[in-house]
């Protein structure tokens, strides 16, 4: 039974928990599980898990991401840990990008791929390829404030429309 669930999940490129009945149980205890490993962020965890539950209950827009969250605060308060534990609890990949590496205007092509006529055009971008491979994932854009404004514009498209087309039209 679990082998079948695993195979179906891989074929459909969805989390294994989505195929089994354990997703409902996992969502019920998501806030409690996160609070057991991340301390002092109860309000943020409550808001985060509330949005995820609403979306997974079918009350969100299926064309958009489950949620887009901005965790701000000083070093060491649990921003990165929340995303790591969330991915683990949901049974999905964590895609982490250090956005301080994307300070220059041309760096956006590293995320979505080079435009036609440029070196590396045949290859996709780091972000777009990863999301194609793992469409159900938690994406962590660490130190986003350091990224170039063109990166923000790309991310606004993702948050607003729920889509991003790479250089290969995928």
Placement of each model-derived feature along the sequence:
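AAA+ P-loop NTPase nucleotide-binding core of proteostasis motors
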Residues: 1-170
């Amino acid at each position: 039974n679990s082998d079948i669930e695993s195979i179906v999940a891989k074929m459909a490129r969805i989390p294994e928990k989505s195929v089994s009945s354990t997703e409902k149980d996992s969502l019920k205890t998501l806030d409690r599980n996160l609070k057991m490993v991340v301390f002092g962020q109860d309000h943020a965890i409550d808001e985060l898990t509330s949005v995820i539950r609403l979306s997974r209950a079918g009350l969100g827009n299926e064309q958009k991401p489950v949620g887009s969250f901005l965790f701000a605060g000083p070093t060491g308060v649990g921003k990165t840990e929340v995303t790591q534990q969330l991915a683990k609890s949901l049974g999905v990949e964590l895609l982490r990008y250090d956005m301080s590496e994307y300070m220059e205007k041309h760096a956006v092509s590293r995320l979505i791929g080079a435009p036609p006529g440029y070196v590396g055009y045949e290859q996709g971008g780091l972000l777009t390829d990863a999301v194609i491979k793992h469409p159900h994932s938690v994406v962590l854009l660490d130190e986003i404030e350091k990224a170039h404004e063109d990166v923000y514009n790309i991310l606004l498209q993702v948050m607003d429309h729920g889509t991003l087309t790479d250089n290969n039209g995928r």
